[in-house]
Amino acid sequence: MTAVVACGHPDSAADDVSRCASPDSSKYTSELRKSDLPWSGGRSPYNAEAKLDDGRRVAMYYLRNKGLVEQHYSPRAKAWTEANLIHRTEADACQGIELRAKHGTVAAIADFGPYCNDGEPPAESIAAVGVDSLTEWDINVTKDFDGWERASVSDDGSEVVFKRNTTLRWSRADGFDDQ
């Protein structure tokens, strides 16, 4: 398992678990991008979007040979931020992306694996949490795990619980639990 904090810089994924500054330094000058993975039929599971209580939106999507990408939207600016790579991997996207938002906290679930297109389970299960300005994301990578089934954000946004047959907890005070 690896804990990573991405601090709003394109392609950032340092092995530093220290907190970054939280003020919103985002520049809202872009349009929303979408996953470059092909999908036929209805809505692509490789794109996800959630609305926050204050009208902002956050979107995540997979990019082939890059990883998990995030953008957020300001209703005041009527624009999106530049794409921010929050987890780099060249493995295939598995399953879809799930986003939950409550009281300024956004929780995300995403999975990757080298043979997911062939039906194999994920090799990397991502639990991610962004708060307030969404310029920083706490990332937890669980290796060789079937993927988180759901994420629940507490009513006040201070805690997130990721569940499958085990539980991973995140809090504003302490970040992710040590496992």
Regions found by a protein language model. Name each.
Residues 36-51, 90-100, 141-155:
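Repeated scaffold domains used in trafficking and secretory/extracellular systems
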Residues 53-59, 103-109, 155-162:
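Entry beta-strands of beta-propeller and related beta-repeat scaffolds
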Residues 62-67, 113-118, 166-170:
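Short glycine/acidic-enriched loop and turn motifs that connect beta-strands
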